Amino acid sequence: MIRYTSEIVSLGLETLRAWPEIWHHRRKVIQCFYDMANASLLMSCVLSLFIGGVLALQSGPVLVERGLSFVVGQLVGLSMCKELAPVMMAILMAGRIGSAITAELGSMKVYQEIDALWTMKINPIHYLVLPRVAAILCALPLLVLFSILVGWMGGGLVSWLNQEIGLSLQAYFSHLKAGISLQDLAQGITKSIFFAMLIGIVSCHHGLQTKGGPRSIGRSVTQSVVQSIVCILISDYAITRIFVWIE
């Protein structure tokens, strides 16, 4: 565990040291960003719409019964901002994008393409890891922001269409707006930046550490996704604790 953590930290620091060279790899970053957004956007839209809808469906009737209909919008808004959108989109990114990164780099490692880069005096960290980490750092916060908006809409539609809740869209969004601040949005975006860095580094690490034949690529992908999700959930608690302490 200590060795694994040190390897992740070492790769993360080396990637950060290579950051001044990001401009030289801008085309690769843009291509990776496009691929990530294209692969995740539709799924994140569907997922967020139903998450917001389920939140309203579960909490709305109970709150309305107790005369707290104004809380429905605030509950959906805060839940999506602070917790559900960042965590769920990060897990989606780990499974959808992180696994692809690990498989790609693992395949290059198995077939000695990484060694060929070293032979040509090309640093794989700069050429392979940096563009992918940078692309995730751009893609995930935007995806989380999009997820928050879609989740709000999902909660609003359920609150409006469900007769047990019976909130108009105007009332729902008015209550939501009253209960949400820019600080709440900033917390969700800040979480997504940390999660993006974790997903990128963990996925690249497992890809670069792949050893053996083609079968080992599958094992690396599985380990990458599992470790990414574990890191996301642990760091989510730590970051939330820091925000609670600051507030």
Mark where each language-model region is.
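Short, membrane-interfacial amphipathic segments enriched in basic
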Residues: 1-27, 206-207, 211
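Cytosolic juxtamembrane amphipathic/interface segments immediately preceding
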Residues: 19-38, 179
